[in-house]
């Protein structure tokens, strides 16, 4: 067992990303062997389709309603241009780019934990635990998933602030927030780390880096005349048409998504709190991220298991912190051997059986049996169930008009639109719960060709 601990889990900082590479490849092979390739979720297909639409001459936010900040859609467009508009090549490149981001994120988690604890094995453990969560290693197979890039840039901004490299840190923080509204915590924390050095020069460089990325991301939107549409869909609509689920509903959903990983999650959170008490000055930002994650999940945004991403990162780091506490209290070699055995078993179980948890983040079962109709419930049905509206109270559209739109569009039709290179006749074709609620509040029609007009409920 000691040899296993020293060889398979050596002190090499590249061990975790190397292991994660093999895990991602296993997930890809699983999908290919099941005959499901190419496969997407409604979200990944939507991002990729918008990227292809812009490549084909359409405009962000105007020709396709979407609440994601611009960098998410612009990166999808870059991939569409690289693939020259071929949807199958675009999808493959999207999977590859997402996996690469996941591998780099694994390295970053491992490296930062090692740096904080001064224990490389603790860092290695954090990286391995991160990749054992099925939602992490399996979601990347479904195409372009922005969350991997969001947290790669976000965690990168914190790492660069700690070193410090203020221009790069500011740029990375802005890129993170430019892909997901709730990543705004990363500019706040990374700026806080920079500010503690009490250097005006560092602060100005940080602001400069952030400004450059903000300018680059907003310029295409401005040139397309989409700033108003972006403001409405990215900022105003989520404020008025956000989620309304109860605390208990969200808690049960979290338990459902985590299942067998609940003990690991609890241990990781305990590790974060213990580490914080040991070194408040060094680890305050970890607790800050944990508090923000709780606000996000229980109040602001928890649509699916991919919204647990930040929590999984923090739990993984917390496991490293917990190991550090154990290794200082007990004999290090014995602890290394025991932890290695547990982690290897957990890794094999989570990768081979996907934790035995079934569907997590996408409309396909892990067994490869095809679409799960319970997951493929249309956005209109979801909205009606959650809010109490009937099918025909959405916007100002008559029933026959709504029926015609629903028969061609919706969450379960996005994949077909993407792979057949189809341009929808309406800008409202995703028909997510938020989109439908916004349409109802502002009395928009299902057949509108252009979205993003300045409207308030």
UniProtKB/Swiss-Prot annotation:
Signal peptide start and end residues: none
Pathway assignment: Cell surface structure biogenesis; S-layer biogenesis; Protein modification; protein glycosylation
Gene Ontology MF: a single term: dolichyl-phosphate-mannose-protein mannosyltransferase activity
Highest taxon above the source species: Archaea
GO cellular component: plasma membrane
One annotated GO biological process: S-layer organization
Keywords: Cell membrane, Glycosyltransferase, Membrane, Transferase, Transmembrane, Transmembrane helix
TM annotation in the entry: 13-33, 92-112, 121-141, 174-194, 212-232, 260-280, 284-304, 308-328, 338-358
Location relative to the cell: Cell membrane
EC number: 2.4.1.-
Membrane-side (Cytoplasmic) residue stretches: 1-12, 113-120, 195-211, 281-283, 329-337
Extracellular side: 34-91, 142-173, 233-259, 305-307, 359-457
One Pfam family named in its UniProt record: Mannosyl_trans4
Mutant phenotype after disruption: Mutants lack the final mannose subunit of the N-linked pentasaccharide.
Bilayer topology annotation: Multi-pass membrane protein
Role this protein plays: Involved in the assembly of a N-linked pentasaccharide that decorates the S-layer glycoprotein and flagellins. Transfers mannose, the terminal pentasaccharide residue, from its dedicated dolichol phosphate carrier to the protein-bound glycan comprising the first four subunits of the N-linked pentasaccharide.
Protein name: Dolichol phosphate-mannose mannosyltransferase
Organism for this UniProt entry: Haloferax volcanii (strain ATCC 29605 / DSM 3757 / JCM 8879 / NBRC 14742 / NCIMB 2012 / VKM B-1768 / DS2) (Halobacterium volcanii)
């Amino acid at each position: 067992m000691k040899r296993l601990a020293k060889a398979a889990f050596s002190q090499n900082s590249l061990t975790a990303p190397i292991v994660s590479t093999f895990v991602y490849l296993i997930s890809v092979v699983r999908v290919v062997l099941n005959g499901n390739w190419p496969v997407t979720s409604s979200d990944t297909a939507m991002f990729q389709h918008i990227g292809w639409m812009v490549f084909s001459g359409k405009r962000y936010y105007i020709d396709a309603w979407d609440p994601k900040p611009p960098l998410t859609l612009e990166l999808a467009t870059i991939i569409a241009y690289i693939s020259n508009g071929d949807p199958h090549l675009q999808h493959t490149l999207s999977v590859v780019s997402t996996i690469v981001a996941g591998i780099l994120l694994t390295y970053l988690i491992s490296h930062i934990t090692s740096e904080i604890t001064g224990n490389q094995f603790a860092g290695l453990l954090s990286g391995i635990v991160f990749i054992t969560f099925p939602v992490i290693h399996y979601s990347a197979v479904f195409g372009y998933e922005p969350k991997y890039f969001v947290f790669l840039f976000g965690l990168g901004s914190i790492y660069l602030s700690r070193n410090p490299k203020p221009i790069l840190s500011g740029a990375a923080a802005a890129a993170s927030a430019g892909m997901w509204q709730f990543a705004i915590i990363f500019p706040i924390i990374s700026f806080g780390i920079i500010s503690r050095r009490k250097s005006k020069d560092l602060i100005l460089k940080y602001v400069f880096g952030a400004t450059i990325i903000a300018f680059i991301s907003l310029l295409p939107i401005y040139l397309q005349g989409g700033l108003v549409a972006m403001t409405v869909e990215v900022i105003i609509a989520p404020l008025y048409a956000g989620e309304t689920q109860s605390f208990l509903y969200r808690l049960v959903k979290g338990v459902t998504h985590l299942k067998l990983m609940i003990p690991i999650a609890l241990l990781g959170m305990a590790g974060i709190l213990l580490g914080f008490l040991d070194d408040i000055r060094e680890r305050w930002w970890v607790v800050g991220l944990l508090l923000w994650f709780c606000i996000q999940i229980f109040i602001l945004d928890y649509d699916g298991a991919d919204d647990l991403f930040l929590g999984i990162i923090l739990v993984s780091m917390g496991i490293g912190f917990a190991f550090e506490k154990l290794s200082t209290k007990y004999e290090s070699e014995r602890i290394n051997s025991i932890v290695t055995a547990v982690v290897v078993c957990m890794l094999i179980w989570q990768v081979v059986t996907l934790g035995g948890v079934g569907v997590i983040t996408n409309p396909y079962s892990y067994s490869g049996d095809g679409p799960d109709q319970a997951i493929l419930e249309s956005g209109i049905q979801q909205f009606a169930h959650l809010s109490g509206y009937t099918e025909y109270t959405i916007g100002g559209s008559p029933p026959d008009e709504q029926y015609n739109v629903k028969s061609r569009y919706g969450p379960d039709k996005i994949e077909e639109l993407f792979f057949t290179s189809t341009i929808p006749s309406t800008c409202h074709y995703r028909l997510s719960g938020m989109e439908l609620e916004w349409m109802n509040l502002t009395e928009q029609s299902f057949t509108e060709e252009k979205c993003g007009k300045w409207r308030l409920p």
